[in-house]
Amino acid sequence: MGFPNESFGDLLDTINLATEMSLDWYTVSVLTPLPSTKIYDQMAEIGLIDVEKVDTKEVNYGSMQTGTQKKLEESRKTSLNEILKINSFSKSELLPRDQLSELWFEVDYEINYKKIFTEKDLKRLNKLSVFLKDINKRMTNFSNPISLYFEHVVNNQLGSKHTEKLLEQAKFHVNDSNLWAQRVSHLNLKELV
C-alpha cells in the first residue's frame, strides 16, 4: 500500500480480494521505494518524495514495516492520536501519505487477525499458532498486544488451558500505551480493555 494515486477504494479492493482468497496469512507493507528505481523516480517527479530530504540511512529496506511500526509506537506512547477508520473515507479519496503506518495497522488487522475469531479448521489454527508464536518471539519481542492476544485466542481455540500469560502480556502493553489503548478500543477487543 502507498502507491502513487492509490485511493481508499483501491485499498478496500485489496482487503476484499485478500478476504475472498482466504489464505492463511498476508504480508502487508507500506511501499518503500528504493533510490535509483523507476517507482522512486516517478514519486520524486510528482512530488511525493523530496530527494533532498531523503535519508536512506533511516530506512530499513529489509523489514520496513516492523521497524516503522516500532518507531511509531514509541513516538506515540503517551499521545492520543485519532485512529483512522478505513470505511470513513470516500472510495475516491487518496491515501494520506502521512497516515500510511496507521492505515497499515488497520489493513493488517482486517486481513490477518479479524478472521481468527471464526476460524474452526484445526490445521489452519495450528499453522496460525506457530506463525503467531514466531511473530511474538522473533519479530516483535513480545511487545505487540494484538499478536499476543491472537496467539492467546488461537491457542484457546485449540484447547490449550495455558494462555493466560499471553493475555496478561497483551494487557500490559495496552495499559502502557495510549496508542495501543486507542487501537484496542477502535477494534472493540473488549478482553484487552
Annotate the PLM regions.
Residues 1-133, 137-139, 161-168, 172, ...:
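A structural motif corresponding to the C-terminal lobe/cap of the Radical SAM core domain
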Residues 28-31, 181-185:
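A generic structural motif
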Residues 137-146, 176, 180:
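Residues that mark the junctions of alpha-helical repeat units in TPR/alpha-solenoid scaffolds
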Residues 146-150, 182-186:
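"A position-specific structural signal for the A-helix of alpha-solenoid helical repeats
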Residues 171, 175, 183-193:
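C-terminal non-catalytic interaction modules
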